[in-house]
Amino acid sequence: MVNFSSVFERIKRLDVQYNKPTKEIRGRDTILPITLTSIFIFFMWGLAYGLLDIMNYHVKVAMGIGRQKAAILAAGYYSAYIPGALLIGGPLVKKAGYRIAMTTGLGVLALGNEFMSIGASRCSLAGMVAAHFVIGLGVSTLERSANPYAVNCGPRRQAALRILMAQAWAGIGTVVAPFLANAFVFDPDTSTARPDPDPLHPGRCQMPTMKTASCSNLGTVITFYRALGACIFALMIFVAVLFFRTNWFPEVEVPISAPVDCGWKKWKHPLVSRRFARIWWGVAANFVNLGCQVTFAQFFIEHMKVNACASDRWAAYYMSLAQTAFVIGRFAAAGLVTMPRIFKPRYVLMCFMAGAVATTAAGTDITATAAIAVAIMVMFFEAPSFPMIFESATASFEEWTPTCETMMIVSISGGALQPALMGQLVESVRISHAWWLTASCFLIVFTYPAATNLIPSFRRALDKAEIGPEAVDHGGADEENGLQRSSTSKENFAVRIVEKVTFRRKKSDETGSTTP
């Protein structure tokens, strides 16, 4: 049996930072590691996420399968977040650190892409679902390690800014994905064909008709994933050299919680208490939130084809525009949280989520150019939700922070549920009215930022983490200093009164003694 502890120990000995004392990471020290991690790690899983929706649509058309079977591909990907975070990413971070976990995640992601090419070459839906599961294992391991690394690599008060900037690079990966699919996957002879108008619903087009299965159309998928897997494997080697043979990426200490033995009485576990209500609320909100984001992305192309009468190629371009708005949304939120005393992160998150609810509801009954514009606005407003929920839900839990981070990554598995429900709704009430499901779910997500602004204990914990304890305590310090000044002035006033009374008594006594 392989002794993983000894394997990790040997890997750590190759690290130039091995057995060296850790230094305090200041704000300017985080620029290089966060920038490079964003480019090499966050961008890569953003690319994988963006390709998931585009490629799944192509596989659905090529194999002639319905929405329910196509949803299984996404379910295979997102269901992997549960074992990926609990059995791979979480233990790796605790045992070996963030950098080894990120390197391992890249390796698993490369392996999953190679499996995808094998499944496509055999025209096997089950094989491609299994490959999506392996890809999900790799991406969940990356997210379990890279997100906390961005949050914890530097002063806590800048955590929201760091993770928003890093996650913006994941958004850039999703922008690049449709262009890659257009260039290497879509058939140029059919991708420019516009759907037929719907005679019963003016301004809309008919649902894309089911085409005859033709596995020969998967040839480009085979080549694409094979090449992508090779590129990711090469990137893994390059990143490993940067991680372990340079001092550019400081190893961030992972706090370890004390073991808790509560037997079968799980309700006595410390996590099951009012102190951790915020993380549980955040997990539930993010579970629903990822379902909304995945559903919107998966049905975006069909939404464009039906309500904007766009061809496959133009629908992919519109998706690129929407993903660009997604990136702009994250950069906009990052710009706002650079001024936390004015734009507190909890305010920013609440405003963006309110915009997501409003625009999704507005897009339920519009067509043509308006449908395109509103869909793009939805992507803009939903952009900062995951990184900001992740950062705020895991703040100020000290030794329980790694466990809370694992819980947040597990919540991404919500992306496996809502798309299946959306597929059934589309079959029943058409895609326009089915968006009410997503709007309602965004409203559920909105309750989390509302709670962080309305519940006093949530507000205090987040302000202490995001603005700094000295800023939160500043009011108390001023009050204490004011009380001290007040008491001092009162004492001085009393002394002056006593002195005046004593002086007058002495003067009256002297006057009385001189009177005959």
What function would you assign to each model-found segment?
Residues G46, G107-R122, A354-T367, A450:
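C-terminal ends and interior cores of transmembrane alpha-helices
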Residues P83-A126:
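Conserved MFS/SLC helix-loop-helix module at the cytosolic interface between two early adjacent transmembrane helices
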Residues I72-L92, S320-A333:
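Central cavity-lining transmembrane alpha-helices of secondary-active solute carriers
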Residues M1-W45, V61, H269-R274:
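Cytosolic juxtamembrane N-terminal segment immediately preceding the first transmembrane helix
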Residues S140-P155, A383-E398:
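Intracellular juxtamembrane helix-capping segments at the cytosolic ends
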Residues L52-N56, A177-F186, K268-T324:
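Extracytoplasmic gate region of multi-pass secondary transporters
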Residues Q158-P195, P202, Q206, E405-Q418:
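Glycine-rich segments within core transmembrane alpha-helices of 12-TM secondary carriers
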Residues P33-M63, L142, A146-N147, A177-P178, ...:
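Extracytoplasmic
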